Regions:
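Short, conserved micro-motifs enriched in small and acidic residues
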Residues: 107-120, 149, 212-215, 364-371
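Acidic/histidine-rich catalytic neighborhood of metal-dependent amide-processing enzymes
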Residues: 115-188, 385
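Glycine/charged-rich beta-loop-alpha catalytic/anionic-binding loops adjacent to active sites
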Residues: 98-111, 314-316, 358-359
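Short beta-strand segments
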Residues: 82-84, 143-145, 170-173, 194-196, ...
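Acidic-glycine-rich active-site phosphate/pyrophosphate-binding loop
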Residues: 87-103, 166, 184-194, 311, ...
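Acidic/His- and Gly-rich active-site-bordering loop/insert found
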Residues: 2-108, 131, 136, 331
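Phosphate-handling active-site elements
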Residues: 73-76, 103-105, 125-141, 225-232, ...
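Metal-dependent amide/peptide-bond hydrolase catalytic core
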Residues: 1, 5-8, 25, 41, ...
Length: 385
């Protein structure tokens, strides 16, 4: 059967995707994330996959690894790993303000573009191949993690073990700005900041001691940190926490993310942040390195995999460019390990035109990209050998 003839029915895909989007799954709620893991495990088991489910660590949800082998048997050792995540940045209750809804060619909803549609598209592609008796040349493993949006602190070692012997890693993050795919991503570095003062700061109308609150000190540091950004290395403060009461603050905490485009920029980012450490262990700013997604620079293996995608796209009359991106994905891990990796295989949508929008209330996907990307994934899986 021609891949173009596979029955990717748009209306059915819209109806089925609703189930995934309405299973809200913020990274730090293991119970909620595990509901998405449940959905994936059921679908994959119904396709005949062998299921491995590993409890998460550090309070995160479970990790799912499921292997399907309807391949021709030409290579049973090194196969394809489809790297997905079940978690989103949206807290429980976000569907009240970001409901699943359709407007013209747009589907809205919390997590609809990142990450639910990417996982759904891959599952649907494999399902269609199996039901149509189209054999793949390689076994396919789905790896679904619960903590990507947090930087993969729980699943990192499991990801590395799962892709180490793979021939290809496919990552269904949203498509690039022009609808193309991603070959290479910036490193993502996280830092935890802690500001302490020698004296607990209690605001009083008669206070003329000159002691500044930890909030004041953190605010000053935030401005300095974000102004360290360059073309190759940016810094962004995402969370700040402080204050027990309106007039009492003992310390102030913050988290910084830095994206670095080159090896030199990774080194520069780390050095700049650690240089901010106070020499006094009891006061001032203290910086700790947190989780990190490594720099992924495309190599010959990735480009050869992209060539296979181009040929798959030609079967569907699709032109597919490639570019590098920030944001971080599981592709950072597989790509940095030297595995042939292809990212940005998910749907088209708002964050393709406006980076960061896929984590905002404006998030949407373009409906016509659901069957398009489903067929593209199916065509690619049928080609790889």
């Amino acid at each position: 059967m021609n891949i173009n003839e596979l029955p990717f029915e748009t209306e059915q895909m819209i109806a089925s995707l609703r189930i995934w989007v309405e299973a809200e799954s913020p990274s730090f709620n293991a119970t909620a994330v595990n509901k998405v893991i449940d959905l994936a495990a059921y679908d994959l088991a119904s396709m005949g996959a062998s299921i491995e489910r590993v409890p998460g660590r550090f309070g995160f949800g479970d990790i799912l690894r499921a292997t399907l082998d309807n391949s021709t048997g030409e290579n049973t050792k090194a196969g394809v790993v489809i790297c997905c995540h079940a978690d989103t940045v949206h807290p429980l209750g976000s569907l009240h303000t970001m409901p699943y809804r359709r407007e013209g060619n747009k589907l809205f909803g919390a997590g609809v573009l990142s990450c639910k549609s990417g996982l759904f598209i891959c599952l649907e592609a494999v399902r269609q191949l199996i039901h149509s008796n189209i054999q793949m040349h390689l076994p396919v493993t789905f790896l679904i993690v619960p903590d990507k949006e947090a930087g993969c602190p729980s699943s990192r070692e499991f990801i590395e073990a799962s892709v180490r012997h793979a021939k290809y890693a496919l990552v269904p993050e949203p498509a690039a700005a022009d609808g193309g795919v991603v070959l290479g991503r910036s490193a993502v570095l996280r830092f935890e900041l802690d500001v302490k003062v020698d004296t607990v700061h209690e605001l009083k109308s008669s206070d003329h001691t000159g002691v500044k609150s930890p909030i004041y000190e953190m605010a000053r540091q935030v401005i300095d940190i974000e102004e360290m950004s360059t073309a190759d290395c940016n810094f962004s403060v995402g969370t700040i926490q402080s204050g027990q009461w309106a007039n009492f603050a003992e310390k102030c905490l913050a988290e910084v993310i830095s994206e670095a485009k080159t090896t030199a920029a990774v080194k520069e980012s780390t050095e700049k942040m650690l240089a901010l450490n106070s020499p006094n262990p009891d006061s001032g700013l203290h910086v700790n390195r947190s989780v990190k997604l490594p720099l992924w620079e495309s190599d010959e293996h990735c480009k050869n995999l992209y060539d296979e995608l181009v040929k798959a796209g030609e079967e569907l009359s699709l032109e597919l460019n490639h570019s590098t991106a920030g944001g971080g994905s599981l592709g950072n891990i597989s790509g940095a390990m030297g595995i042939a990796t292809l990212d940005g295989l998910g749907a088209r949508g708002l964050c393709n035109q406006l980076p960061g929008a896929c984590r905002s209330r404006a998030e949407y996907l373009e409906i016509d990209s659901l069957p398009e990307r489903g067929k593209l994934m199916a065509a690619l899986l049928a080609r790889l050998n």
